[in-house]
Amino acid sequence: MQYVYIFIGGALGALLRYLISFLNTDGGFPIGTLVANLTGAFIMGLLTALTIAFFSNHPTLKKAITTGFLGALTTFSTFQLELIHMFDHQQFITLLLYAITSYVFGILLCYVGIKLGGGLS
């Protein structure tokens, strides 16, 4: 049954990722990928903190959200491909801005999620 929950979570995450991708319409800064990855980082941090209080009794739901939903929502491979595309087009400032923003804010939002989740549990 766990696989069904992961499948459903993955389908929902993929659908949301697809909808967010429409933010990338101008061919410039890939805001859709950034939004998807930063949202995923925050939710992962939040769920990590809530695991002790809530998800210890619901491990299948945790797998559905983390492995399924967040696994499909976030996209490290697209992020890497976009960085290579920027490099190939000599968009070095945009490349650095995107990479630094993604990593720094990803870590920061994951941390905020952990702290917020700790306060809720």
Curated annotation (Swiss-Prot):
It comes from the Bacteria. It holds the Pfam family CRCB. Keywords: Cell membrane, Ion channel, Ion transport, Membrane, Metal-binding, Sodium, Transmembrane, Transmembrane helix, Transport. Fluoride-specific ion channel. Important for reducing fluoride concentration in the cell, thus reducing its toxicity. One of its GO terms (biological process) is cellular detoxification of fluoride. It is a multi-pass membrane protein. One of its GO terms (molecular function) is metal ion binding. One of its GO terms (cellular component) is plasma membrane. Na(+) binds at residues 71, 74. Belongs to the fluoride channel Fluc/FEX (TC 1.A.43) family. The chain crosses the membrane at residues 3-23, 35-55, 64-84, 92-112. Na(+) is not transported, but it plays an essential structural role and its presence is essential for fluoride channel function. InterPro entries: FluC. It catalyses: fluoride(in) = fluoride(out). The gene is fluC1. It is found in: Cell membrane. This is Fluoride-specific ion channel FluC 1.
